[in-house]
Amino acid sequence: MKAMIFAAGLGTRLKPLTDTLPKALVPLAGKTLLQWQIERLKAAGITDIVMNVHHFADKIIDYLRQNDNFGCNIQVSDERDMLLETGGGLRKAQPLITSSPLTSSPNSLITSSPILVCNVDILSNIDIPALLRAYNPEEMGLVVVMPRDTQRYLVFDDTQRLCGWTNIATGEVRGPISNSQYPIANTRNLAFSGMHVLNPRIFSCMDELVALKGEKFSLIDLYVHIAEKEVLRAYIPENYRMMDVGKISQLSEAEAFAASL
C-alpha cells in the first residue's frame, strides 16, 4: 500500500521559522516533522510514500535526497504552481499513488490497496496496523476522530457512518444531516484528528466536486459531498494522543510530546 503525506502548507502559524524553512523541515526533538512522519510509516511497514510540496519545495526535495529518502520509495507531487488544499492535493497526486512503485506507470493500477493519508504537522501515538485492520474495502474509508473541544466537527450516526459536518460557533451544518427529511438518530460530533485510510475509489468521486469548486478543495469538503452515497466511518483509537504542531507557541510542548512517543 501507499501513504500520502500532506507537506505543502505555508506554515504561517509557525513563523518566523517558516520564513526560511518549509513546515515539513521544522525541527522537533532532534528530528524534522517530516522525519517523524516517515519513520512512523516505515515502522508500520509502509515504505511507498507520496508527498506534496509547495513552500520551499526545493529544500524538501534536497533534504530527502541527502537522507536517501530514509530508506523508502518517496515520490513528490509538485504543487509549486498552485497550492491545492488536501482534496485537490490528493487528486493531483493520483498518478503517483495509483501507479506501481516499480514502473511509475498510472496504467498499473493498485485497485485494492487502501491509501493512508496523514498531515506532516500532526503527531500521534496511533497504532497504524490496528487502523489498517479496521479498514473495510467494501466502504470508502476510515477517518481518525476523537471527542475533543473544537468549533468544527464531523457528525456521525449511531453506526459510526459520516453524515455531515457542523460549525458549532456559527451554527452551519452541511451534508446529509442538513436535510430535515434525512432519517438520522443519535448523531455524535467528533473532531478530525489527522489521519485517514481511503479506498482508491475515492478518486472517482472527485469530478463532481471539482466541477462545483474547482481544483482546490479539502478532503472534508469531499467527504461531506459524498456522504449520502458513500460510507466513511469514524475510527476512534484507544488511548489516543495527538498534537497539531501548528503554532510557534506550541513547540516546547510538542518537543515533550514527540519525546514521549
Each language-model region and where it sits:
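A generic "binding-loop/recognition-motif" signal
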Residues: 10, 21, 56, 80, ...
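Glycine-rich N-terminal loop/short-helix segment of MobA-like nucleotidyltransferase
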Residues: 2-29, 42-44, 236
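Catalytic-core segments of class I nucleotidyltransferases/pyrophosphorylases
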Residues: 116, 123, 129-136, 161-261
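Generic preference for hydrophobic
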Residues: 25, 76-77, 141, 234
